[in-house]
From Swiss-Prot:
Residues 383-451 form a coiled coil. Keywords: Coiled coil, Ligase. It holds the Pfam family Rossmann-like_BshC. The gene is bshC. One of its GO terms (molecular function) is ligase activity. It comes from Staphylococcus haemolyticus (strain JCSC1435). This is Putative cysteine ligase BshC. Its EC number is 6.-.-.-. NCBIfam families: thiol_BshC (TIGR03998).
Length: 537
C-alpha cells in the first residue's frame, strides 16, 4: 500500500489557527500542540496514583478477549505508570464511521512516535463512549455499491430502541445479522469478503451487548498495535471515579458558572459555541430504566424524565453505594477521562477539540490538568478504479476530496454543449430584460400594472432558466456513462458533501484492501500530521 501526505488549504479556520499557534485560540488550552516542549513537559508530569487500579480494570474489561503480547505489555506498562495517548468514540454499527478507525490509528501513531522519542512506553488507549444513550447516532452506517454507483444506508432495526446507555443494551442477534447481510449484499465480492463476513458473524454470535460487539471488532482489527480498550460505562471504572463524581455534585454550581463564563469568552473571541446544554449539574443518573439528566432546582436535584428528587446528601450517598448509575455529560466527561489517566495527548475530531476549549476553567476548578489536544488524522482511500477515472477525466484528486465533483462535471457538460445555443439563450434573456425595464418605466405610476409586469418578467426569466437547464440536462443524459462515473467519484471521494471517512464504513475498506489492512504489517507507516493522507493499493 502507498501512503501520500497531501497539504490542503484548510477549510476549517480553527484547525489553521491551531497549526499556526494562534494566541487567541491557545489561551483556552493549557498546552501548545505543535511545540515539542509541550510533550516534554507532559512526559515529565508526576502520575496521579490511579494507574495500578486502572490497569487492573482494563485487564478485567478485556478479559473476554485473547490479548496479544503487545497489549499485555501495555497493560503492565500502564500499571507501572506509563503515560497514554487517548481518544474515544461512540460505538457505531460495524465500527463505523471510518473516522473511528482513523482516531485509533492517530492514537497508535502518536503513542509510537512518543515512545521512540522519549525512550519510554506511551500506551495507546481507546475510550468507548458506552455511557451515551443517543441510539440514533450509532444504529446505522453506509455502504457503497460500486456496481450501481450508489451509497446506501444500512440500519439496525428495532421496535424498542434503548433509552439508557448503549452499554446496557443487548441487541437482537437476528436483527444484527440481518443488518450485516444487507451490508454485504451491497459490497462487491472480493477474496476478502467471506473471511470478513465470518469475522463479523462470529463476533455477533459470541458477544451480547452493543458495546461488547463493538469492542470485539476493534480488538480484532487493532490488537497487534497493542491498543487498550475501556468502556466509559464500565462498573469497576465507575467505582474508581467516585471521588470525582462527588466533587462534581458538591461543586456543581461553580462548575456550571466557570463553564458558562468560559463559553462566553470563547464566543467573544470569535469561536463558534459547541456545547449546547441546559443543565446546571452536568451528570446523568440511571433511573426507571432511562438515562436521565440531573438538574438543580429549588434546592433539590431533579431528573429530566421522572418526578423523583434528591437532596445533595442523598446523591452523594448514592454515588458511594451505586456509582454505576451515574454517568458524565459533555462537560464532565473530558475531565473525568483526564482525572483517570496519566495522559500526554488527547486526540479527537474537529468538533471535539473545539468544545474542549469551553472546558478550560472546568479543568482548572477541579484541579485536573488538560492534556495536549490534537485533531485526529484525516485519511482517504483510493481504489484502482478511482485512480483510473481521475486520470481519464484529468481531475485533481485533492480538489475532488475537498470540494466534490460538481465543478468538474459542469465543466464537462459545458464542453459538450453548443456555445452558440447557450449564448443565444443568454442574449435572448438579456434582450427581454431590457424590454421589461422599458415596460416597467411605462407603468411605474400604476402599482397594479407594475406588479403585473414584474410577475410576467419573473415567469419569462424562469422559462429561459428552465430552457437552459433542460438543455444541459439532455447533454448529461446523452453522456450518461460519464455522468455515472462522475457520481461514482463523488460518492467515493466526497460522499454527502464531505470527507469519505465521515460516511464510509471500515468494513468497506477491509473488503477492498484486505481483512488485515489496518494491521501494522500491512498499513503504511505513518507520522502524525495535520494534513490529509491519501492511501492507495
Amino acid at each position: 500500500m502507498d501512503c501520500r501526505v497531501t497539504h490542503f488549504k484548510e477549510k476549517d479556520s480553527f484547525i489553521s489557527k491551531l497549526k499556526e499557534s494562534d494566541k487567541s485560540l491557545l489561551e483556552f488550552y493549557q498546552y501548545n500542540p505543535v511545540e515539542t516542549a509541550s510533550f516534554t513537559t507532559k512526559m515529565k508530569r508526576p502520575n496521579n496514583g490511579r494507574e495500578k487500579q486502572l490497569a487492573q480494570i482494563i485487564k478485567d474489561y478485556m478479559a473476554d478477549l485473547k490479548l496479544t503480547t503487545s497489549q499485555l505489555e501495555h497493560i503492565e506498562a500502564l500499571e507501572q505508570g506509563a503515560k497514554v495517548v487517548i481518544g474515544g468514540q461512540q460505538a457505531g454499527l460495524f465500527g463505523g464511521p471510518l473516522y473511528t478507525f482513523h482516531k485509533i490509528l492517530s492514537i497508535v501513531t502518536l503513542s509510537s512516535q512518543l515512545t521512540k522519542e522519549y525512550g519510554e512506553t506511551v500506551v495507546p488507549v481507546f475510550w468507548i463512549a458506552g455511557e451515551d444513550h443517543d441510539f440514533d447516532e450509532v444504529n446505522h452506517t453506509y455502504v457503497y455499491n460500486a456496481k450501481e454507483a450508489q451509497l446506501k444506508k444500512v440500519k439496525y432495526h428495532t421496535m424498542t430502541p434503548p433509552e439508557t446507555n448503549v452499554s446496557r443494551y443487548t441487541p437482537d442477534k437476528e436483527a444484527m445479522l440481518n443488518a450485516l447481510n444487507l451490508f454485504f449484499e451491497e459490497l462487491k465480492e472480493t477474496n476478502h469478503s467471506k473471511p470478513l463476513y465470518k469475522l463479523c458473524v462470529d463476533i455477533i454470535n459470541e458477544f451480547d451487548t452493543w458495546t461488547d460487539i463493538f469492542k470485539a471488532l476493534l480488538h480484532a482489527v487493532f490488537k497487534e498495535h497493542g491498543v487498550l480498550l475501556i468502556d466509559a460505562q464500565n462498573d469497576k471504572l465507575r467505582q474508581l471515579e467516585k471521588p470525582l463524581l462527588k466533587q462534581i455534585v458538591t461543586n456543581h454550581s461553580k462548575i456550571n458558572q466557570v463553564f458558562r463564563q468560559t463559553q462566553e469568552q470563547t464566543i467573544a473571541s470569535g469561536l463558534t459555541q459547541m456545547i449546547q446544554t441546559d443543565t446546571n449539574v452536568h451528570l446523568f443518573l440511571h433511573e426507571d430504566g432511562m438515562r436521565q439528566l440531573i438538574s438543580k432546582e429549588d434546592n433539590l436535584f431533579k431528573l429530566s424524565k421522572s418526578d423523583i428528587t434528591y437532596s445533595e446528601e442523598e446523591l452523594i450517598e448514592l454515588i458511594e453505594t451505586e456509582p454505576e448509575r451515574f454517568s458524565n455529560n459533555v462537560v464532565t466527561r473530558p475531565v473525568m477521562e483526564e482525572w483517570l489517566f496519566n495522559t500526554v495527548a488527547f486526540i479527537g475530531g474537529p468538533s471535539e477539540i473545539k468544545y474542549w476549549a469551553e472546558l478550560n476553567n472546568v479543568f482548572k476548578l477541579l484541579n485536573v490538568e488538560m492534556p495536549i489536544v490534537l485533531p485526529r488524522m484525516k485519511m482517504t482511500y483510493m481504489m484502482e478504479r478511482t485512480q483510473k477515472l481521475l486520470k481519464q477525466y484529468s481531475l485533481n484528486v485533492e480538489k475532488v476530496i475537498q470540494n466534490g465533483i460538481d465543478d468538474d462535471k459542469n465543466e464537462f457538460v459545458r464542453e459538450k454543449a453548443s456555445d452558440t445555443f447557450i449564448q443565444q439563450v443568454e442574449e435572448l434573456k438579456a434582450k427581454h430584460e431590457n424590454v421589461y425595464q422599458q415596460l416597467l418605466n411605462e407603468v411605474k405610476e400604476n402599482q397594479d400594472n407594475f406588479n403585473l409586469v414584474t410577475k410576467n418578467e419573473e415567469i419569462h426569466n424562469k422559462q429561459f432558466d428552465y430552457l437552459l437547464k433542460r438543455y444541459l440536462l439532455n447533454i448529461e443524459r446523452e453522456n450518461d456513462i460519464s455522468m455515472r462515473q462522475f457520481r461514482e467519484l463523488d460518492l467515493v471521494l466526497h460522499p454527502h458533501h464531505g470527507l469519505q471517512e465521515r460516511i464510509w464504513n471500515p468494513l468497506q475498506i477491509m473488503n477492498d484492501f484486505g481483512i488485515d489492512v489496518f494491521s501494522p504489517s500491512t498499513f503504511p507507516p505513518l507520522e502524525y500530521t495535520f494534513d490529509q493522507i491519501i492511501i492507495k493499493p
